[in-house]
Amino acid sequence: MKKRFLSICTMTIAALATTTMVNTSYAKTDTESHNHSSLGTENKNVLDINSSSHNIKPSQNKSYPSVILPNNNRHQIFNTTQGHYDAVSFIYIPIDGGYMSGSGVVVGENEILTNKHVVNGAKGNPRNISVHPSAKNENDYPNGKFVGQEIIPYPGNSDLAILRVSPNEHNQHIGQVVKPATISSNTDTRINENITVTGYPGDKPLATMWESVGKVVYIGGEELRYDLSTVGGNSGSPVFNGKNQVIGIHYGGVDNKYNSSVYINDFVQQFLRNNIPDINIQ
């Protein structure tokens, strides 16, 4: 993980979306040292993908780009349909015989918040993206499947995108099947505040929901940093405050220092209001 760094900006960010290795000979070597169960039964190998707005650290020595910090308090969520967990979603994109996976959160009748670098894996075709809200594992999707319809990238540099999905086979909207998450106005968000990042890390069995617990260490502009640990596949995970409101969308981190999300400040909130008619910001 020490070479082939991109030079778009001065800070190196470890990408936290899981995707398929195109170089299969290299992929086989990487995958052998990791938990194969998180890749499903097809032995699909994974690597990070490039974000359109951040320096991404290419995965060289491990399949799942990760920023594991001293605070590695991660635990599995089994009651995925309960409370605010219901809106947390597993994102799946088939790519070149394999797949990419990430995370997101339902925030409107038809809308999911995630990262640009996650939806970019669909190569411009949102119908390649499947969303499974409150997924329990690769064989148990209690709230079914929704297919992407439209991608709306945030106009700024921040790694944020809205994914609009079509109704399911029963003509139900995703925001009818699960209760959309509440967005925090962030007027009270502070340093040292307790937070959680909840999503679908790639080092765990496929499509299992995990929560990481930590504290805010920095707030500035459209960036929120924290001291908790994350792994590839967590990209797009919602960052929840103590009221279970979304204060950010996780995208990456810096080795041995911190993890980061897009902070939902006033500019981001206006973007959400402009594109999600029923967005709930409190």
Curated annotation (Swiss-Prot):
GO terms for cellular component: extracellular region. InterPro entries: Glutamyl_endopeptidase, Peptidase_S1_PA, Peptidase_S1_PA_chymotrypsin, Peptidase_S1B, Peptidase_S1B_tx, V8_ser_AS. Its EC number is 3.4.21.19. Residues 28-66 form a propeptide. GO terms for molecular function: serine-type endopeptidase activity. The keyword Protease applies. GO terms for biological process: proteolysis. Residues 1-27 form the signal peptide. It comes from the Bacteria. The active site is at 117 (charge relay system), 159 (charge relay system), 235 (charge relay system). Monomer. This is Glutamyl endopeptidase. The lineage of its organism: Bacteria, Bacillati, Bacillota, Bacilli, Bacillales. The gene is gseA.
